[in-house]
């Protein structure tokens, strides 16, 4: 069984914001794999299905970003999901819009949703797909930037990145994460 989590904030006012690119990637996987995110439990919206013979759970924590670990840990405990069967997808200010970086482990890098996940799991040793949103320009505050929407021009790159992240997740069902990293970190 595999768990794929996308980080974001709940509520219509946060839809399509930079901070919600993880939710957008989960929505793409749900559509692609015909998985309904219709279960509300573990402080999140989730759904499960079979993809290439592998049971997959997709989760969007509904705790707000800074408390994401409160949703992820109980679900992992309930379904007895090992760290190697878990991927988290989230926005990254240090990557250009549309770029992905897959990592096997690492610090939170200033991301509060990842910080919460590390705190609740008790380790940094989990796989992740960092999705670039770039840094704010013209002195804009980071909080205003990440809670702002992508421009129409950026959405072209964002949609490509979401598709690429979904492809990486799909490949991960049949390959090791290290192999997927080698294929997608180029």
UniProtKB/Swiss-Prot annotation:
Keywords: Cytoplasm, Hydrolase, RNA-binding, tRNA-binding. The record marks 9 as: Discriminates between blocked and unblocked aminoacyl-tRNA. GO terms for biological process: protein quality control for misfolded or incompletely synthesized proteins; rescue of stalled ribosome. Pfam families: Pept_tRNA_hydro. TRNA binds at residues 14, 64, 66, 112. It catalyses: an N-acyl-L-alpha-aminoacyl-tRNA + H2O = an N-acyl-L-amino acid + a tRNA + H(+). GO terms for cellular component: cytoplasm. It is an enzyme of class 3 (hydrolase). The active site is at residue 19. It comes from the Bacteria. Hydrolyzes ribosome-free peptidyl-tRNAs (with 1 or more amino acids incorporated), which drop off the ribosome during protein synthesis, or as a result of ribosome stalling. Catalyzes the release of premature peptidyl moieties from peptidyl-tRNA molecules trapped in stalled 50S ribosomal subunits, and thus maintains levels of free tRNAs and 50S ribosomes. Belongs to the PTH family. HAMAP family: Pept_tRNA_hydro_bact. This is Peptidyl-tRNA hydrolase. It comes from Bacillus cytotoxicus (strain DSM 22905 / CIP 110041 / 391-98 / NVH 391-98).
């Amino acid at each position: 069984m595999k768990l794929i989590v996308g980080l974001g904030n709940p509520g219509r006012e946060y839809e399509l914001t930079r901070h919600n690119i993880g939710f957008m990637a989960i929505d793409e996987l749900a559509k692609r794999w015909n998985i309904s995110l219709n279960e509300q439990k573990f402080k999140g919206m989730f759904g499960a299905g079979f993809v290439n013979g592998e049971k997959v759970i997709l989760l969007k924590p509904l705790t707000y970003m800074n408390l994401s670990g409160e949703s992820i840990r109980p679900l992992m405990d309930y379904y007895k999901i090992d760290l190697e069967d878990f991927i988290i997808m989230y926005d990254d200010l240090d990557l250009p819009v549309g770029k992905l970086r897959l990592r096997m482990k690492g610090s939170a890098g200033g991301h509060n949703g990842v910080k919460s996940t590390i705190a609740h799991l008790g380790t940094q040793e989990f796989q992740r797909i960092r999705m670039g949103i770039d840094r704010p320009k013209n002195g804009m505050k980071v909080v205003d930037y990440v809670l702002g929407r992508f421009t129409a021009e950026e959405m072209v790159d964002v949609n490509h990145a979401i598709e690429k992240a979904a492809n990486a997740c799909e490949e991960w069902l049949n390959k090791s994460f290290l192999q997927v990293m080698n294929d997608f970190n180029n």
